[in-house]
Structure formats: structure tokens, C-alpha cells
Amino acid sequence: MIATGMAALPLHAQTARHTLRIGFQKSSTLMILLKSRETLEKALAPLGASVQWYEFTSGLPLLESLNIGNLDLSADVADAVPPFALAAGANLTYYAIETPSPEAQAIVVRQDSPIREIAQLKGQRIAFAKGAGAHYLLLEALAGAGLSIRDIEPAYLSPADARAAFERGSVAAWVIWDPFLAAVQRQANARILRDGKGLSSYRRFYLAATPYAQRHGAVLAAVYDELRRAGEWVKQHPAAAAQWHAPLIGLDAPTVEAANRRRTYQVQTVDAASLDEQQRIADAFGSQKILPRRVVVADSPVWRRT
């Protein structure tokens, strides 16, 4: 494991004028907060960095863009996403985590569905985003019922397409994360069949392109500090945070507040426990022949604040 920090480069290399390109998604609450307030633009200006923002529908396309050089930093993605990117050869640095929020993703069915337990998903069409945390949650839930991914019919859909399919009844279940989970509960009366408790901790990972992490440790340190402050504010001011966030993602404030209650928003540096779980996730996907090759998480660089 390589610790990536700022000490190896002279100051002028770290403060040279450049643009930090950040990818995020609707579940990236803290980055959306920083974006809406232009917090990073102000904090990074003394370091010579401006900021550009790019929105994605889910985590895997975000990390693919990071890997091919179109982004420098990824907002939080679910715990299953990095192993997929690493299996594809991505040169990514583990940057930070949000501590576990296992109830912030779940397998849901319609309220009138006869399905009451995971074993009844056998042979059913189930919607989820490939490579998302939802994918791993489904894998673990099925395994607990003596099933595998081969026992169901996967419907790899974006959250918007999956919501439409769920409401039409063209899928029997949907595996989804907040805030989409809270939205379908409140707006479509979806019933939780199983959440992540005891199956998937649902840590959320921030990642950086390794070349960027090697050259711009001071910028990453400043972003990290702002993420921590943003997380503390959201948890300390839940109603205000929901009122602010809701119009930015097209939801009502009570739905956003319900979603935020299930997330910790506690930002930390990447620790051994989170990397160990990353390896377990990679091995679980590998055992089902879902990944093209074995992933060794310990081979990936880890950013350390210096």
C-alpha cells in the first residue's frame, strides 16, 4: 500500500494554477453542499486551483470517467464501486470515507407485493445499478437465502429508469440507495424487504485520480477539511440541511431529511477496516465471476493527510 501525500513535491508543484474537476451524483450530499455555496472555490483559490463540477447518475460511470482522465476527484460512491473500477485497471487513490450507513440502501417491493422474504426473489426480475452498492447488497442478501445472482433476472437500470419500471410493475423488486430510497418510500409507498444491516456496511468512498493525488496533496487536504465541516453541519442542522438540499435534487424537504437521518456524513481518512471490507466485496464479486479479474485492494494507493 502506498501512502500518497504532499511531502514529496516542492510547493510550487502543488500550488501551480490548475482546475480541479470533481464528479458527483445526487446522493453526494456533502459535495453538493460545497458546490452550492462555492466553498471549494473560495478555499482553493489561495492554492491556485479553480473548480469544475460534473454530475453522474451513479458511481461506476463516475469512476470510469475518473480513470480515463476526465476527472480528478470523485465525490462519495458506494462501497461496491471501487472494486469494479479496480478490476477494470483503474489507477485510483483511496482518498476518504464516510462511516457506515447500512440503512441508507435497501431492497424494496411494492406495498401489495406477495414477496415477504428474500427467498421469494428466486426467478424474479430485480432492478439495480450494476457495480453500485445496491449490487453488493443484493448479492449478500441472496447468499443469505441460499441463492446467487444466477437465480434472479437482473435488470441493470439507472435510478430513474428503475423507478419507472418499479412503478409499472415490470420488476418485482428494486435495490436502491438514498435519497431515491426515501423518495420511493414516501411517494410510491414502497416496502423495505431488507436493508443493509448485517449484510453491507455501506461506507461511502471518495477517490482521486492517482496522478492528481501525487501532485496536489495540499488541495486534497483543503477539500478533506471542508468535507468534514460540511458533514458536521448537515447532522447538526437536519431541518436546515434538508430545506437547502431538497430543491437542488428535485425532492421535498421531508424526503431529504428522512434520507439524511440514515447517513452518518462522518468523513474520515481511509482505515484498515474499510480496506479489509473492500477486499471482501471484491472477493464476493469475484466468486460470482462478476469481475473480470481478481482485485487486490492493498495494491491501491491510499491518501494520507500530512
Sequence positions of predicted segments:
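Small-molecule pocket liners
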Residues: 31, 101-107, 190-191, 202-206, ...
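Short helix-loop capping/hinge motifs at secondary-structure junctions, enriched
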Residues: 111-119, 147-149, 211-220
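Solvent-exposed, polar/charged alpha-helical surfaces in well-ordered, non-transmembrane soluble domains
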Residues: 38, 42, 64, 68, ...
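Secondary-structure end/capping motifs
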Residues: 214-292
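Conserved C-terminal helix/tail region of periplasmic/extracytoplasmic solute-binding proteins
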Residues: 285-306
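Short, glycine-/small- and polar/acidic-enriched structural segments
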Residues: 14-145, 155-156, 172-176, 200
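Pocket-lining segment of extracytoplasmic ligand-binding domains
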Residues: 80, 154-155, 160-247
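N-terminal export signals
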Residues: 1-14
